Structures are given as C-alpha cells and as structure tokens.
Amino acid sequence: RREILAGLADGSIDLCIGTHALLTEDVQYARLGLVITDEQHRFGVGQRAALSKKAASPHMLVLSATPIPRTLALIIYGDLDVSVIDELPPGRQRVDTFAVNESYRQRLNGFIRRQVAQGHQVFIVCPLIAEDDQLPDERKAVAAYADKLRREVFPDLRIAVLHGRMKAREKEAVMAAFAAGESDILVSTTVVEVGVDVPNANLMVVENAERFGLSQLHQLRGRVGRGSAKSWCILLSDSENEDTRRRLRVLTETNDGFKISEEDLKLRGPGDFFGQRQHGLPTLKAADLSCDMRLLDEAQTAACALLAQDPTLADPAHGALRRRIDRLFAVNEGGLN
C-alpha cells in the first residue's frame, strides 16, 4: 500500500483500479484527470464530496446497472449529462418473469430439472445464510436449503453453495466452478447480485421474494438472460400483503429497469429509495417526484441558467437563495460539493 500511495502522489502510476479506499484522506493524486465509478448506486454523495477534494475538476464517468428514476437523477446527478442504454445486447432475449406461491413447488422442481437436462444451469437465491431459531418463519436459508435439495429433491444433480461469510478464496472457487459448468445449481444469497456473468445460466429462482426490494430483484434477474438461450426468473412468495403482491407484479409486467425504479420510488419514497447513502434530499410537502417531471425539468433549466450567470451566488439579489442552500446542505466554509 505504501508503494502504491507514493506512486499515485508522484504520478508514476498512470491507472489505478480500487475500491472506496481510493477516496480516503491519505490518498493523494499528482494529476487526477479521469475518474470512472462503476456500480455508482453503491456510492453515496459523501464519497462524491471526498472525490471533489482530490482534484480541481477531473473528468467523471459514472456507471450503474441499477436504474434510478429520472426525476431523482435530475437532483442527484444534475451536474452530469445522463446517457441511457435501454436496449438488450445483440442476441439476447427478454427474461420472462413469474410470481408464484408454494403450490407451484413441484412444477418448479420439474422445470429446474428440465433446464439442467438441457445443459443449462440454475441460480437459487435465499434471503438468509443460516437458519435462526429466533426467526420462526418460513424464510429459506442457504445452507439448510441446499442440504435439503441434495437429500430430497435433486440428489443426482451437482449443487454448490455461495454466501458472504465464506472466505474470498472459497467464493472465487465456487463461482469459477459454476462458470465452468462444474455445478448445475448454485444456491446463494444476494452475493451474486452484481459482477456475475454465467451465460449458460438461464433460470433464476428467488425464494421468499417478498424479502427483497424491487431494484434488488431486478438486479438478480439480470444474472440470467446473458446468453442466447431463453431465460426465466421465478419469484416465490406466499405473502398475501397487497404491497408485496403489487411489487412482484411490476416485475412480471416489465423488464424496463427505469419503469421499475419509478414504481420503487412511488412505493418507498425518495428517502427510503436511497437510504442513508444519499443524503441531502429534501422532504417534500407538496411536490411528487414521481409525477412532477416537467416541473423538475424546468427547475433544472432555471438553475443552470442562474449558475451560468452567478456561479457562486455572490449577487446580493441571490443572497436568500444562497443562505437557503447553505442550510439545506449544511455547507462548511461556503463551498458547495
């Protein structure tokens, strides 16, 4: 680490790939010119503020496979140009999604077996790693459920297990074996949500789907349909809760991540949508972010025009606005991040 820090500081390192560690205080850059942030939804505005202190004005490219509503994009990324890739790569097919309850279990098991017999592989995602006696419900746990599948349901199939408590080397070995076709079924937690590319896997089964958010389910669905074969996502839930049924119904009706994110916004609101990772969003008393798209567009245009005329809001006529912004974002030393 010491050598890398020295190389970044003196400019002898041209390209550095890393995690949030690149934003810590002890990391200094000689001439930071370009920052590419992958999985941007996993970074908060705090990280963006930290990055702004590393260089005067580096070029920035942020990428995210988890769409956010365009209404919120205008607020969170108002200083960036937003480009959308909303088409499937050539050769890929739409993933068909079904929400079913436990009464479909036997049919589902038969469907899993047929897919494996045809040479494909299957993801099964559970909400828990291990069973907890303090949680006397019917939530599936990875370890116990995989054992049950091996003993009672698919004793002749190759079943692997993957979860976050495994050592990094173990996880890498399991994923490499699955990608190489050495296992038929991977029973996992949401650790497979991002960064997994197995084109031969064409079936995603999500147990206790009511335990997951819409965006998370959409990400999990994205683990299949990465090859040319027809793919499916099965959402299992016995919940009778109307909000849950509505959420799952959205996924069965569309594969459009932006429509899904808009629905997520309606269901959870902007605060819960981003959680503590994205602070600074005002509590709105009248506006509705899911409906007031035109008004937000006009507000952004007006804000850009104002900042072009008075970038620091130094004009006395803009004093009240400046003070309001300072209070809203708790700005220190009069600087905007």
Regions found by a protein language model. Give the residues of each.
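Inter-lobe coupling/hinge segments of SF2-like helicase ATPases
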Residues: 1-249, 309-312, 337
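C-terminal accessory region of SF2 helicases/translocases
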Residues: 232, 240-337
